[in-house]
């Protein structure tokens, strides 16, 4: 029997409920649902504090993915989608979140979220999404002042990283840490196209380059 090929690009889906928090006496329960091109995420907030979250791969239906990931985040809490007072949809499929009261671009959400978590000193947010890569500039209140986006090619995007993870047989969650394991400056991959860059990476491996150097 042929051995099943491991999919190194496939990152683990997960969920978590913050211990020690109780929603039953909460005044406001809110949710943010990010339906991306590759992954769908839900974060549940109770009175302005994180209560539960989940992330899973986006399916063929944006609406179905939004409901599935939100129900998974709520699993075991006693909460249902109907108990959430206000929901915002964001990401590639933001307008298809059926239970959301509002849809906001992921660019605005990134800026506000970074400001909420790390405070007013944040000025730049980098987002490597599944189909594009964004550099976002924001002010001390988390308002977007400028942004740049690469949406023309998979090179430099999350999907591009998945391609290299599978090529190098490295689990996707190890790509970042292992790329920092070399002490020398890596040779740049000359191609800006992920297809040609993959071919170039194959050539480097055949030339005897270690996996970590190719990753870097």
Please report, for each region that a protein language model flagged, where it lies by residue.
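Adenine-nucleotide phosphate-binding core of ATP-dependent small-molecule kinases
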Residues: 199-216
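Short glycine-rich, Thr/Ser-proximal phosphate-binding strand/loop in the N-terminal lobe
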Residues: 32-68, 72, 151-152
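Gly/Thr-rich phosphate-binding beta-strand-loop-beta motif of the actin/hexokinase/Hsp70
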Residues: 19-51, 122-142
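Flexible inter-domain linker/hinge segments
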Residues: 1-27
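Internal, active-site/partner-interface "lid" segment
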Residues: 171-204
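Short beta-strand-loop/turn "lid" adjacent to the catalytic site in phosphate-handling enzymes
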Residues: 52-59, 77-108, 136, 142-145
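Glycine-rich phosphate-binding loop plus the immediately following alpha-helix
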Residues: 59-62, 143-181
